[in-house]
Amino acid sequence: MNRPHSATGDRPLALVDEHAHAWSPKTARARFRKGLTGPTAGVAAGHTQANLISVPADWAYDMLLFCTRNPQPCPVLDVTDAGSWTTVLADGADLRTDLPRYRVWRDGELVDEPSDVREHWRDDLVTFLIGCSFTFEWALAAAGVPIRHVEQGRNVPMYVTSRACRPAGRLRGPMVVSMRPVPPAHLSAAIHESSLLPAVHGSPVHCGDPSALGIDDLDRPDFGEAVYREPDDIPVFWACGVTPQAAVMASRPPFALTHAPGQMFLTDARDEQYRVA
């Protein structure tokens, strides 16, 4: 699978605002609607973030089945009616304008990365909102786990793996993972805290040697940006909601809209709503 060209290239993406952790989700969405872009890690503390993918209605069942068969990378939080750009997860939000950046796909090829997709919108699009691991970073931080990409003001690194997802109808593709370097003393806390939030990917799929996932070079992520790792840090990999984008690249549906990796939809839902005992 070829790495898609990004409009941002390899230049660092600063966090959207140094005070963004204190924003409400509504404030964040309003700023994104006005054109603010950038990774949303650390934005709107304590609120659930979501990946987005919109597909034509005649592909929606395949996508729903794909997510159902692959719940760790694709945990569904909401599915809209065809043509709807609203969601029960965020009152008054517009899914066409309220993310920092989107991706437009035609026949599996990335053709645009706008900050507003109203001109690309179609009445037959069904939108899936899928849980994002940025949500559990607050729990990790509260447990003392350093979040390296946030510390460094970078997007989280994401990698296409050698693990195939279960196919569904016309959709197939590999699992994508996000990686966070974790000091050994904090590894058990990272695993435990994330495991309590299965709706946003839950516990890691792998800790340690990246070659076990078919990843050759941690400094060359397929999406996002490489992060500096301390010498004793352990690379920890979580299933990632960019997996549907990898399925789009592999399966080549005629049209799809997605979020740009790392630039998520901010919901009004509190992370506690998805926390299990």
UniProtKB/Swiss-Prot annotation:
InterPro entries the record matches: D-Glu_cyclase (IPR009906), Putative_hydro-lyase (IPR038021), UPF0317 (IPR016938)
Enzyme Commission code(s) on record: 4.2.1.-
A GO molecular function held by the record: lyase activity
Enzyme's top EC category: lyase
Keywords: Lyase
Leader sequence residues: none
Family: Belongs to the D-glutamate cyclase family.
Record-linked PANTHER family: D-GLUTAMATE CYCLASE, MITOCHONDRIAL
Protein name per its UniProtKB record: Putative hydro-lyase SCO1412
Species, as recorded: Streptomyces coelicolor (strain ATCC BAA-471 / A3(2) / M145)
Lineage per the UniProt record: Bacteria, Bacillati, Actinomycetota, Actinomycetes, Kitasatosporales
